[in-house]
C-alpha cells in the first residue's frame, strides 16, 4: 500500500481553484483508487464569515461539500494518473444524503475524508465526511464528472 501526501504548492498545480475558493490546504494521505484524507484550516479571515454570520461566524454547509469535492478531485486525478490542464474540468454531478451535524467555526481544522465508491466513464461516486477533531461536521455522497472542454 502506497500513500501520497500533497502540500499547498502541489495542490495548486492540480486544482484550478484559487482564493477565496481553494478549500483544501494539505493532503495528509491518499491511497490510489481508494481514499484521501485532507485538511482545510478555517480562519476568521475567510471572506464568507463577513456575512455568515457576523454575530456568530459559521462555515456554510455548501462550502464543506465543496471542500469534499475538491478532495475528491485530487483523489480522482491521482487514481487515474491525470495531471489536469486548462481543458480539464471537474464538475459536481450530484449530492445525496447531505447531513450537517455540527457548526464549523473560525479556528477549527476541518479533516476531509473521501472514499471512492465507483469510477466509470468519467463519472465517480464518493462517500465523504468532514470532521472537526473526532466530531462529524458533515457527510454526503458525492458524484462528480471529469470533462474536457475546448
Swiss-Prot record:
Its main location: cytoplasm. Gene3D superfamilies: Hotdog Thioesterase. Pfam families: FabA. It is an enzyme of class 4 (lyase). InterPro entries: FabA_FabZ, FabZ, HotDog_dom_sf. CDD domains: FabZ (cd01288). Keywords: Cytoplasm, Lipid A biosynthesis, Lipid biosynthesis, Lipid metabolism, Lyase. It catalyses: a (3R)-hydroxyacyl-[ACP] = a (2E)-enoyl-[ACP] + H2O. GO terms for molecular function: (3R)-hydroxyacyl-[acyl-carrier-protein] dehydratase activity. It is found in: Cytoplasm. The keyword Transport does not apply. One of its GO terms (biological process) is fatty acid biosynthetic process. Its EC number is 4.2.1.59. GO terms for cellular component: cytoplasm; membrane. The keyword Iron-sulfur does not apply. The active site is at residue 52. Involved in unsaturated fatty acids biosynthesis. Catalyzes the dehydration of short chain beta-hydroxyacyl-ACPs and long chain saturated and unsaturated beta-hydroxyacyl-ACPs. PANTHER family: 3-HYDROXYACYL-[ACYL-CARRIER-PROTEIN] DEHYDRATASE. Belongs to the thioester dehydratase family. FabZ subfamily. This is 3-hydroxyacyl-[acyl-carrier-protein] dehydratase FabZ. The lineage of its organism: Bacteria, Pseudomonadati, Pseudomonadota, Betaproteobacteria, Burkholderiales.
Amino acid at each position: 500500500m502506497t500513500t501520497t501526501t500533497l502540500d499547498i504548492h502541489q495542490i495548486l498545480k492540480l486544482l484550478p481553484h484559487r482564493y477565496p475558493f481553494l478549500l483544501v490546504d494539505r493532503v495528509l494521505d491518499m491511497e490510489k483508487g481508494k481514499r484521501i484524507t485532507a485538511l482545510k484550516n478555517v480562519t476568521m479571515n475567510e471572506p464568507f464569515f463577513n456575512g455568515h454570520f457576523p454575530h456568530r461566524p459559521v462555515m456554510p454547509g455548501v462550502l464543506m461539500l465543496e471542500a469534499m469535492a475538491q478532495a475528491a478531485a485530487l483523489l480522482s486525478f491521482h487514481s487515474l494518473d491525470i495531471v489536469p490542464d486548462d481543458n480539464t474540468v471537474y464538475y459536481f454531478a450530484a449530492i445525496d444524503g447531505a447531513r450537517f451535524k455540527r457548526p464549523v467555526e473560525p479556528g477549527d481544522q476541518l479533516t476531509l475524508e473521501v472514499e471512492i465508491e465507483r469510477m466509470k466513464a468519467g463519472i465517480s461516486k464518493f462517500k465523504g465526511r468532514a470532521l472537526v477533531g473526532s466530531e462529524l461536521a458533515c457527510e454526503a455522497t458525492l458524484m462528480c464528472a471529469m470533462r474536457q472542454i475546448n
